[in-house]
Amino acid sequence: MAPQSLPSSRMAPLGMLLGLLMAACFTFCLSHQNLKEFALTNPEKSSTKETERKETKAEEELDAEVLEVFHPTHEWQALQPGQAVPAGSHVRLNLQTGEREAKLQYEDKFRNNLKGKRLDINTNTYTSQDLKSALAKFKEGAEMESSKEDKARQAEVKRLFRPIEELKKDFDELNVVIETDMQIMVRLINKFNSSSSSLEEKIAALFDLEYYVHQMDNAQDLLSFGGLQVVINGLNSTEPLVKEYAAFVLGAAFSSNPKVQVEAIEGGALQKLLVILATEQPLTAKKKVLFALCSLLRHFPYAQRQFLKLGGLQVLRTLVQEKGTEVLAVRVVTLLYDLVTEKMFAEEEAELTQEMSPEKLQQYRQVHLLPGLWEQGWCEITAHLLALPEHDAREKVLQTLGVLLTTCRDRYRQDPQLGRTLASLQAEYQVLASLELQDGEDEGYFQELLGSVNSLLKELR
């Protein structure tokens, strides 16, 4: 049986359907091929974009983490993941919780000024050359500032003080003269030596002159223009005040000034001083004269020898035996102690060091002071002065008794009053020394006095 053919009205739709299917299949194949070609020809570009996208995301996450800063306190606090810990913080791992914890260190208690903030240190901001330039400018600025301050200070000094030349010029215009010490002393000597000056003016001139001659150079200048002899001659005045203040000036000029001492001996000062001490004069005048005598004799063996020749020990003996002269007696005893020890030390120094000149050593050896003291009865005089009530006076007398012990030992032993006085002082100073020990003074004043008394008693047994 022959096959049946389809009518033409059905064939047309089938052909259209088949054509659409073929067109769709072709389009799909073409698009798939283009996609593969695109993927194969641009792999690097696609990978770079993906990497940049991931890095950007990581940086954003990192910035977010950095901005979350941990603020430590003095108590332990748990650290969250990603938190920034300020430098200097103390970090530990809590073994119980497994968390990291942080707090401030103890030494940061008073110097945590950053409050946990990060310092933005950008090393690319300044180069080393920039820093050097900035430092140079800073130094220049400091120097300029210092220079400005110096100029301002100098201007202030110039405003307050004027040059000496300008002052002299102004003084010349005002008839005012700036005097040197030498000129002042010449004027004072002329005032004192003028017959037209009153007693008050003469005393005022001597009083002012004493201030200047304390300086060694001024005292020698006084000698150079003849002023020293004028003052020495003032010791002959009939006015006790003139004698007193003239001796006051001489005592200041003689003190530790060998050149002036020599000229004073040659000018007759020693004889005049002894005459005043040997005659009836006010106590104040004799104090000043005795001061001048002590200044003249100390460290001047030639003057000491002349003092002995002129009967100085007799004059002093008479002085201390007068009533109401206890103050002078203590000063005389102190002078004798100084002269005796001075000679002893000078001879010892000459033997040990051999630095003293033979001439001066010979002068000291010619001063026979200890034999003179023994002959003039100073052993007994000094011992009787131990009865003075003042502790300071007793101290000086005890010192003098000690240096005279070798010369006066026999006379001390034969003096019953001295033994009783020493025993009384021993009992008195034992009580006072024990009080010092109770107050915690191991080397007190009264303990030293007690030691001197005990030493004398031991030597005289």
Swiss-Prot record:
Pfam families per UniProt: Fes1 (PF08609)
Glycan attachment positions: N193, N236
GO annotation, cellular component aspect: endoplasmic reticulum; endoplasmic reticulum lumen; extracellular space
Tissue specificity statement from the Swiss-Prot or TrEMBL entry: Highly expressed in tissues which produce large amounts of secreted proteins such as kidney, liver and placenta. Also expressed in colon, heart, lung, ovary, pancreas, peripheral leukocyte, prostate, spleen and thymus. Expressed at low levels throughout the brain.
Compartments, as annotated in UniProt: Endoplasmic reticulum lumen
SUPFAM superfamilies the record matches: ARM repeat
Keywords, in A-Z order: Disease variant, Endoplasmic reticulum, Glycoprotein, Protein transport, Signal, Translocation, Transport, Ubl conjugation
Gene Ontology MF annotations: adenyl-nucleotide exchange factor activity; identical protein binding; unfolded protein binding
InterPro entries from the UniProt entry: ARM-like (IPR011989), ARM-type_fold (IPR016024), Hsp70_NEF-Inhibitors (IPR050693), Nucleotide_exch_fac_Fes1 (IPR013918)
Quaternary structure annotation from Swiss-Prot or TrEMBL: Interacts with HSPA5.
Name this protein carries in UniProt: Nucleotide exchange factor SIL1
Organism, scientific name: Homo sapiens
Upper taxonomic lineage: Eukaryota, Metazoa, Chordata, Craniata, Vertebrata
